[in-house]
Amino acid sequence: MNQLKNSYKMINKKIKRIAFNRAAKTYDDYSVLQKQISLDLFDRLSLIKISPNFILDLGSGTGENNSGFKNIYKNKNIINYDFSERMLMRAKSKEKDFLGLNKLLGKNNISYICGDMEYLPIKKNLIDLVWSSSSLQWCNDLNKTFLGIKEILNYGGLFIFSTFGPKTLTELSAINKKLLRNDTVNSFTDMHQIGDMLVANGFS
């Protein structure tokens, strides 16, 4: 495991959380790249035969993925998990217009947890589908994150994700400057090393 430590620079989570909280209201206006990546990931997910009861969206942000989950899976339990409380508040506000109808029909099945994805306060083997789109780059310890995800996944569950690699540094720097008022980005782990980490943590 020591040989599989990720190459990210240590992230000051407190500073990043403040930045995302500040950007919550306008995040959707600028996150074009992230939205396209999520659409591509949904295309891949739609080809996989799985009927999850519990879906966990790690780094859910403003809840943009909720409609995609609802389109593929009907009446399932969706958990939005993010370390920015204001991002989650924004996600809740998108759902509020439908809460009355959802409660009436018994379909109000979205919950929200504010926390760090490196520390998942979720029951073991509960989650059938763990989704993470454009968020793993905010982890300081990918090995720890993958181990935590493996522990909460149900037997036969699916972990599907996308993350940024070294070649996306230029694009992400421009996005960070607009959204977070910061043009610095991390050095990202390449997919070969991420693959090794996944295997080391029991994924197949």
Predicted features along the sequence, with ranges:
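Conserved catalytic/acceptor-binding region of the Class I
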Residues: L158-S204
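A short glycine-rich, Lys/Arg-flanked "PGG" loop and its adjoining helix->strand segment in the class I
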Residues: N143-L158
